[in-house]
Amino acid sequence: MGMKLHGPAMSPAVMRVIATLKEKDLDFELVPVNMQAGDHKKEPFITLNPFGQVPAFEDGDLKLFESRAITQYIAHTYADKGNQLLANDPKKMAIMSVWMEVESQKFDPVASKLTFEIVIKPMLGMVTDDAAVAENEEKLGKVLDVYESRLKDSKYLGGDSFTLADLHHAPAMNYLMGTKVKSLFDSRPHVSAWCADILARPAWSKAIEYKQ
């Protein structure tokens, strides 16, 4: 029984897992979930993720949800496959873990709100809340200031090598690069170079093909 990833490829959380699977050069089945029809809140999906959110993931008899837990499982379990996505000693692993937490607690909440307001709402025919955009642009700028300082001394957030701490940013960055928010990244040279590096990875190019 092979790996199955449940969810729409348009979802940043689903894309986070697809990118990890592609970095590891692993075969998997992407199982569509019609969120507009509310299928993520019904059986059989709700058995896989009782919170009714995408993605859900199966590897044999193992069932997981929460995208970052899934990516860590893949990176650890298939460490000998594809590209290494984890730090290689306890201290480096701790630093990587710090920046994984920063992504989930500081970067993603703000980036997700901006993506919703600037990208998703127009797609759904909804009106963008300009005040919310301005507020979250300011918040994102402050986060990216910290990143700029970190990336002056380190090629990647976790150290010299690309890890999950960097990969986890890719879906939100990919959406924001097509909006005016791109200027927040471009105006910080180390952040800009880091972002370009991540989005130019072959595995990411393969991952975004699923959105077509």
Curated annotation (Swiss-Prot):
Q: Does the keyword Transferase apply?
A: yes
Domain GST N-terminal residue range list: 1-82
Note whether Nuclease occurs among the keywords. no
What PROSITE patterns does the annotation carry?
A: GST_CTER (PS50405), GST_NTER (PS50404)
Superkingdom field: Eukaryota
Q: Name one GO biological process term.
A: auxin-activated signaling pathway
- Which molecular-function annotations from GO does this UniProt entry contain? glutathione binding; glutathione transferase activity
Enumerate the InterPro entries for this protein. Answer: Glutathione-S-Trfase_C-like, Glutathione-S-Trfase_C_sf, Glutathione_S-Trfase_N, GST_C, GST_Phi_C, Thioredoxin-like_sf
Which EC numbers does the record give? Answer: 2.5.1.18
Q: What class of enzyme is it?
A: transferase
GO CC, alphabetical: cytoplasm
According to its UniProt record, which protein family does this protein belong to? Belongs to the GST superfamily. Phi family.
Q: What is this protein called?
A: Glutathione S-transferase
What organism does the record attribute this protein to? Answer: Hyoscyamus muticus
